[in-house]
Amino acid sequence: METRRIKNQGAVGSCVAHSLSSIIEYYNYTQTGDDRPMSVGYIYGNRRTSDYEGEGMIMRDALEAVRQYGDVAHEEFPYNEEVPKMIKLFEYNGRKLFKKSYPNRISQYARVTSQNAIKSALMAGNPVLMAMVWYADMEVVDGVLTTSCLGYDGGHCMFIYGWDERGWKVQNSWGEDWGNHGCMIVPYDMDIEETWIVSDNIIENTTLKKPFSCMLSRPIAKIINKIVKIFNK
């Protein structure tokens, strides 16, 4: 897998939305050749305020929002503001764009906990969304993230696009001047809190007339769809 364009979230707590928009860009480019930048603000503004307060997003909620509603091109929704302003912008303008965002959905996602599962996903061409604790003393030295775990600075979301003998190849959203041109190696022994496989492998559901999304294996999903077709005859 290759990295996508390096983005910069600035002072806005939109790391989850930045990573997800980059993943959608990856799928658009690899599947159709479409290299347009996708909107961070559309994903961030679609955050459900009833679930929690404060900045940022819960990864699972963000994944579900992108599965249901997708994303639009950056030019359609070019905002990167902090909440609650971002949510108000979305409520005013974002809902008008559902028809354009719907084709840019992910089809399914699943949480994984083993290194082998992460590597299998990457080999299949699926990026892996990740979250880890961030410390104030973290820095990238010779391309590798280092820390003494001093000064807890909250959680941070990025995405994994590969690996080597040193650790996971990770793309960040702090601009090209950060780390190794915006990327880094996260050592295998460094604590990662969450990892999610993000897939754009759409399976058609003939009953609902829309993509069938689940966390079942593809063979099982195919069997389900065959049964559905039989009962639809």
What residue ranges belong to the model's regions?
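Phosphate-handling active-site elements
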Residues: 25-42
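Predominantly the structural core of cysteine protease catalytic domains
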Residues: 11, 17-25, 49-171, 176-221
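Low-complexity, charge- and small-residue-enriched intrinsically disordered regions
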Residues: 221-233
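Short amphipathic alpha-helical segments, especially helix-boundary/capping motifs
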Residues: 1, 37-42, 93-95
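Asp/Glu-centered strand-loop micro-motifs enriched in Gly/Pro and often flanked by an aromatic residue
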Residues: 1-10
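Acidic/histidine-rich, metal-coordinating catalytic segments
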Residues: 38-48, 133
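Homeobox/homeodomain signature
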Residues: 2, 33, 174-176
